[in-house]
């Protein structure tokens, strides 16, 4: 736990109290993702020294864009914050966080239409792209809400509908990996970003918890195994973002943390813990090869250290939390 706490402390070094964001110049959604990493750490470890960050961040950020309530110009940005609110509920038991998450789900659902047979649009209000991440996040959010609201049927119905659409969309390719999205309503062959392989795992765990349909876990395990054994995404057994090789943009350094967070959810849900050794190997490599010596970690988990920022550090916190 000491290494995870040190990584959290280093991540908090990027937090700006005046704006309620981690590195305000970075993409807004990454503060929602960093908040989730912090909440996951607190929930797993029982260490709540930074609990004050939750309400401080939420009360500022929920009013920042558009009409408030974490609305943005893309549905995935809203979904990251909504899922963090689900985790805030798990940690505190306070229903107001679920209320925020429900507001997010309803807003995202407003961008579902019949184009390509269903699915939510990524970009709003333009509506030019239906992609994997927005629909994976929406699915996970719907199923998570159902599982936390006794007597619910509406979120479950929407979750099942979303999964049926996603499963039929063609975004899951023949290699068992998820491509980025659709072009003319067919798989666009886009990059297999690690977070697209991850969020769907957590979504299917939540949906299996709701339905008991073992076919869902079979799909999740197929994607997880394809990712963890891929020479493209896990060369030498260490998770690697495709863009690491050419220089990652501002978003990509967050992706591996999102993958391992959701892989851990699957691993802890399945009795035999099939991905425990993989997660342990990632953490060992991170600690040995990716640090600057001050508990800050770069994007290359196999090394060498490149630089420190919120996205890289939140991914490290995600990873070290999985092995607590």
Give, region by region, the residue ranges found by the protein language model.
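CBM-like carbohydrate-recognition segments
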Residues: 1-37, 41-80, 88-92, 97, ...
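The canonical alpha-helical register within tetratricopeptide repeats
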Residues: 10, 56, 60, 103-107, ...
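Extended ligand-binding groove/face enriched in aromatic
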Residues: 52-144, 157-160
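Secretory-pathway/luminal and periplasmic proteins that interact with or process carbohydrate-rich
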Residues: 63-67, 110-115, 168-173, 229-234
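Inter-helical turn/loop segments and adjacent helix faces that build the functional surface
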Residues: 92-95, 145-154, 207-214
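Active-site cradle of extracellular carbohydrate-active enzymes
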Residues: 135, 142-146, 154-207
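Oxyanion-binding "anion nests"
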Residues: 196-211, 215-232
């Amino acid at each position: 736990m000491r290494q995870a706490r040190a990584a959290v402390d280093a991540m908090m070094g990027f937090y700006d109290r005046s704006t309620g964001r981690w590195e305000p110049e970075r993409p807004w959604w990454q503060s929602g993702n960093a908040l989730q990493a912090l909440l996951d750490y607190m929930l797993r470890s029982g260490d709540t020294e930074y609990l004050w960050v939750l309400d401080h961040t939420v009360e500022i950020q929920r009013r920042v864009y558009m009409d408030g309530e974490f609305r943005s110009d893309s549905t995935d940005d809203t979904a990251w914050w909504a899922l963090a609110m689900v985790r805030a509920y798990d940690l505190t038991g306070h229903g107001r966080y679920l209320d925020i998450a429900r507001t997010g789900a309803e807003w995202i659902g407003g961008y579902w239409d019949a184009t390509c047979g269903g699915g939510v649009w990524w970009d709003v209000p333009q509506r030019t792209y239906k992609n994997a991440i927005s629909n994976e996040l929406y699915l996970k959010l719907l199923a998570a809400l159902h599982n936390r609201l006794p007597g619910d049927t509406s979120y479950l119905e929407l979750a099942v509908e979303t999964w049926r659409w996603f499963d039929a969309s063609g975004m899951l390719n023949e290699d068992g990996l998820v491509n980025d999205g659709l072009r003319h309503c067919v798989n666009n062959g886009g990059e297999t970003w690690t977070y697209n392989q991850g969020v769907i795992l957590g979504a299917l765990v939540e949906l299996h918890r709701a339905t008991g349909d073992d076919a869902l876990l079979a799909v999740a395990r197929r994607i997880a195994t394809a990712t963890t054994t891929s020479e493209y995404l896990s060369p030498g057994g260490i998770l690697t973002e495709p863009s690491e090789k050419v220089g990652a943009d501002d978003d990509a350094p967050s992706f591996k943390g999102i993958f391992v967070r959701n892989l851990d959810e699957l691993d802890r849900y399945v009795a035999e813990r099939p991905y425990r050794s993989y997660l342990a190997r990632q953490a060992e490599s991170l600690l040995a090869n990716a640090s600057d010596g001050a508990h800050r970690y770069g994007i290359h988990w196999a090394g060498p250290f490149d630089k420190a920022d919120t996205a890289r550090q939140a991914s490290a916190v995600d990873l070290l939390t999985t092995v607590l």
